[in-house]
UniProtKB/Swiss-Prot annotation:
The lineage of its organism: Eukaryota, Metazoa, Chordata, Craniata, Vertebrata. GO terms for molecular function: protein serine/threonine phosphatase inhibitor activity. The gene is PABIR3. It comes from Homo sapiens (Human). Belongs to the FAM122 family. It comes from the Eukaryota. This is PABIR family member 1.
Length: 195
């Protein structure tokens, strides 16, 4: 009974309104030719051929051309994430390297200060000219030429300090601070000399 009502409710429209009505309902972008309707047999054969050609063209095109922008944006996003991860790894590596360098420098300073304190504990009476070698042990990375320069400079400095300052410095802390000052003076003077 529902089929009979559907058949009765269907009314055919004149061909001019069919063509105009089909223009509004069309999803295909091909224009109508001279008012022919969408259901005419002339257009149906051409449309089937065009549709099959378009699908095969799309398949061939997908093999030749790069993927659509959506896939490209995913790969670009993946690439950016990898670059950020590498940057993060590089930053962590650099901070770890700086930390290890600082630890190594602090250990070398502690060892040098222990050597200076030990040297001052042995020789508390005088600061003689033979002692500049202990300062050279604090700076183990110097080249041979720099060590000779340091030794000569320290001998002159200690000879002068022996007369002026060392007799007035009674505590080991004062002597240690003076050693720090001498080391800084030597490092600064060596940088100016070799640059």
């Amino acid at each position: 009974m529902a089929q009979e009502k559907m058949k009765l409710g269907f009314k055919s429209l004149p061909s001019s309104t069919t063509a105009d009505g089909n223009i509004l309902r069309r999803v295909n972008s091909a224009p109508l030719i001279n008012g022919l309707g969408f259901n005419s047999q002339v257009l149906q054969a051409d449309m089937l051929r065009i549709r099959t050609n378009r699908t095969t063209f799309r398949n061939r095109r997908s093999l030749l051309l790069p993927p659509p922008p959506f896939h490209g944006s995913i790969s670009r996003l993946h690439q950016i994430k990898q670059e950020e991860a590498m940057d993060l790894i590089n930053r962590e590596t650099m901070s770890e390297w700086k930390l290890q360098s600082e630890i190594q420098i602090s250990h070398s300073w502690e060892e040098g200060l222990k050597l200076v304190k030990w040297h001052f504990n042995i020789n508390q009476k005088r600061f003689s000219k033979a002692q500049p070698t202990c300062f050279l042990l604090i700076l183990p990375n110097c080249q041979k030429i720099m060590c000779i320069y340091f030794q000569l400079l320290l001998m002159e400095t200690t000879a002068m300090l022996d007369l002026l300052v060392i007799r007035q410095l009674k505590s080991a802390l004062s002597q240690t601070l003076l050693c720090h000052l001498l080391i800084l003076v030597l490092i600064c003077s060596s940088r100016q000399t070799f640059n």
